[in-house]
Amino acid sequence: MRVRTLICTFGFNEKKVLVAMRSIPYSRLVLVAGKDVLDGAEYRLMVALEEKSGGTVETVIVDPFDFADCYDGVDRAIRSHLTGGDVTLNISGGTKILADAAILAAFQNGVEAYHCEESMVKLPVMRGVRFEDAFSVEDVKVMENFVEGDSTKSIGARMPDLSDASLRKSLKHLERLGVIVPALEKGEARYHSTPGHRDIAALAGRCMR
């Protein structure tokens, strides 16, 4: 019999997780949360309710303000329970950073994801498509070498092994993806990063290794 695991991001509001627990069938509950949450009455309530129903709570501790750490924690939890079982993710609890990292981990692993508050909303997850498919090796190198306010010339000077054509192609691609944005400054195009640029670069690079 396949085990059905429900993984929930969790903060200081137990109501969102309770909606998921009522709406999504599961036999094992995993909470992904920051260390501070463990001392809260909300967390103790979740553990007590699950134990009362004959279950246990597995807790994965992450830094809820560190995108990469959140992603790694959720990704490990998903992978560890996918073997011989099914995994469903609820991302309605915790910080926005934790929720964003969790949905990306769901995307990477092709598992169903929901956002549960007053009602349950299924999130789009494409099976067979992975995060790193959006980026070329050159794209990752450009992201890793990028400095705020760079021009094409200044980036190219730090990446002599990349041809001018390949560099311009990567910059245009990253611009289309919304990772960087160009701005005309003193007659020259300079690039600025969007929020999460470093996290995206680190994650894309790690996925390709």
Tell what function each PLM region has:
Residues 1-86, 100-209:
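Long, low-complexity, Lys/Arg-enriched
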Residues 90-101:
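Elongated alpha-helical scaffolds
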